[in-house]
C-alpha cells in the first residue's frame, strides 16, 4: 500500500492547479523571510533597565543604613549607564553581564518590597540567589527595614527574574543576543510557523484536497463491492493526503535551512526561547487580564509579558527542541484539517460546497477564539491552537497540548 501512497503523492504534485498553489505558497514564504530579515536590521536586542526604585524607602528608621542603601543604588545606576552604553556599541558580552546583574538586583528588590508570600509567587528565587552570589552582587534584603509601605504589585519581579536567567544563559553559552524577527537556518522554521502557517495551512489543505472526492468517486464505487478493502482504501488515502501536505510544508523549509547555513551557521540551535511550561501538562487556560493590558518585552525570539501573572510559568528551552515541538504541532494540525475536509467531502457531494463549509467552520472557530478571548469553552476549540509558535512560547491563552 505504500506504493499506492507514493503514487497518490506523485499524482497530486503533477496536477497543474496544485503546482500553482505550491509556487504561490513558496513565494509567500520567501517574501516573509525577506521582510523579517530586513526588519531584524532595524530591531535591536538592546533594552533599557528600570533600576531600583527608592520611592518606598525612608531614612527615618535608620539614617546610616539608608546612606548605605543609596550608595548601592548609585553603584547600580553607574552599572546601568555603562551597560546601556555597551548595548548601544554592540559590545554584547559586557551588555549581557550587565543585564544579568541589574535584573537579579531588580528581582530581589521586588521581592523585598512586596508583601506577597514568597513560596506562592516568587518562583526561581533560589536561582536568583545563586546568580547573586555567582556575580558577587550585594544582598538588598538587608535594607528591608527602610521600606515604609510594601506593595502588592509583583509583575515586574517576573520580568526581571526571566531577564536574569535569559541573559545568564546567553553568557554561559557564548551566544550573541538576537531579535524577534531574526532569520537564520536555526530560526527559519519557527518564523514560518508563527507568521504564515496559522492562516495559510488550512487554506492550503482545503485548496489542495477539495477535488479529491470527485476524482476518487468512481474508484470508491468499485471498492464498495470488494469486502474489507474500503476501510483500507480510505485509511491509505488519508495517509497519502497528510503526507502530501506535509511534504509541501516541510520541503521548502528544509531548503531554506540548507541555503542559510553557509551565511549564518547553526550556532543558534541552542539559543534560549521562553516556553509556557503548564501548557505541556494538559489543556491549560490562562487566568489573565487580557492582551490589551499586557506589555510585551522582546527576549530574543520570544515576547515576554511584564504584567501577566502567568509569567513565572515560563521556562527556557533550546531552539532546536522548540523547533521539534512546533513541527509536531504542524503534523497534528495538518492531520486534523485533512480529516475535516475528508469528512465534509464524504457528507457533501459538491466539492465547492464542502470547501466552503470547511473554510466557514474554521473561520468561525478562529473568530470565536482570538488571542484575547477569555472564555474557557475555547479550551476545546481546535482553532485555539492554530498558532504553534504562540501556543508553545506563551503568548497565547491556551497551552500547547
Question: For the regions a protein language model found, what residue spans apply to each?
Answer:
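Membrane-interface helix starts
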Residues: 9-27, 351-355
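Helix-loop interface residues and adjacent transmembrane-helix termini in multi-pass membrane transporters
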Residues: 227, 347-348
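Membrane-embedded or membrane-proximal helical elements that form or frame transporter/channel pores
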Residues: 33, 37-206, 388-400
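Transmembrane helix segments
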Residues: 323, 351-378
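Helix-loop-helix units of permease transmembrane domains in multi-pass membrane transporters
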Residues: 4-8, 13, 210-244
Amino acid at each position: 500500500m505504500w506504493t499506492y501512497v507514493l503514487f497518490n503523492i506523485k499524482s497530486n504534485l503533477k496536477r497543474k492547479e496544485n503546482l500553482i498553489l505550491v509556487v504561490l505558497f513558496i513565494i509567500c514564504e520567501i517574501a516573509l523571510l525577506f521582510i523579517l530579515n530586513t526588519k531584524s536590521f532595524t530591531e535591536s536586542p538592546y533594552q533599557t533597565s528600570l533600576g531600583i526604585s527608592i520611592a518606598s524607602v525612608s531614612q527615618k528608621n535608620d539614617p546610616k543604613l539608608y546612606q548605605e542603601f543609596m550608595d548601592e543604588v548609585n553603584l547600580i545606576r553607574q552599572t546601568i549607564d555603562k551597560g546601556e552604553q555597551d548595548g548601544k556599541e554592540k559590545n554584547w558580552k559586557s551588555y549581557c553581564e550587565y543585564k544579568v546583574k541589574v535584573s537579579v538586583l531588580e528581582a530581589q528588590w521586588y521581592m523585598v518590597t512586596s508583601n506577597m508570600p514568597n513560596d506562592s509567587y516568587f518562583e526561581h528565587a533560589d536561582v536568583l540567589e545563586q546568580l547573586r552570589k555567582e556575580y558577587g552582587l550585594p544582598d538588598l534584603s538587608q535594607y528591608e527595614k527602610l521600606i515604609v509601605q510594601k506593595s502588592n504589585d509583583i509583575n515586574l519581579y517576573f520580568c526581571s527574574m526571566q531577564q536574569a536567567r535569559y541573559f545568564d544563559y546567553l553568557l554561559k553559552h557564548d551566544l550573541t543576543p538576537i531579535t524577534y524577527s531574526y532569520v537564520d537556518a536555526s530560526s527559519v522554521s519557527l518564523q514560518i510557523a508563527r507568521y504564515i502557517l496559522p492562516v495559510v495551512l488550512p487554506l492550503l489543505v482545503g485548496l489542495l484536497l477539495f477535488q479529491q472526492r470527485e476524482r476518487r468517486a468512481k474508484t470508491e464505487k468499485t471498492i464498495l463491492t470488494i469486502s474489507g478493502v474500503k476501510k483500507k482504501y480510505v485509511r491509505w488515502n488519508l495517509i497519502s493526503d497528510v503526507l502530501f501536505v506535509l511534504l509541501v510544508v516541510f520541503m521548502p523549509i528544509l531548503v531554506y535551512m540548507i541555503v542559510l547555513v553557509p551565511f549564518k551557521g547553526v550556532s543558534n540551535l541552542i539559543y534560549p526561547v521562553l516556553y509556557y511550561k503548564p501548557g505541556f501538562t494538559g489543556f491549560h487556560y490562562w487566568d489573565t487580564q487580557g492582551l490589551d493590558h499586557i506589555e510585551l518585552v522582546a527576549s530574543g525570539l520570544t515576547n515576554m509579558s511584564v504584567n501577566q501573572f502567568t509569567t513565572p510559568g515560563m521556562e527556557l528551552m533550546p531552539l532546536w527542541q522548540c523547533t521539534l515541538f512546533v513541527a509536531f504541532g504542524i503534523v497534528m494540525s495538518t492531520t486534523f484539517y485533512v480529516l475535516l475536509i475528508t469528512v465534509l467531502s464524504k457528507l457533501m457531494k459538491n466539492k465547492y460546497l464542502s470547501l466552503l463549509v470547511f473554510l466557514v467552520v474554521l473561520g468561525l472557530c478562529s473568530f470565536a477564539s482570538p488571542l484575547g478571548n477569555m472564555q474557557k469553552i475555547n479550551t476545546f476549540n481546535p482553532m485555539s491552537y492554530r498558532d504553534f509558535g504562540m501556543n508553545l512560547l506563551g503568548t497565547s491563552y491556551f497551552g500547547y497540548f
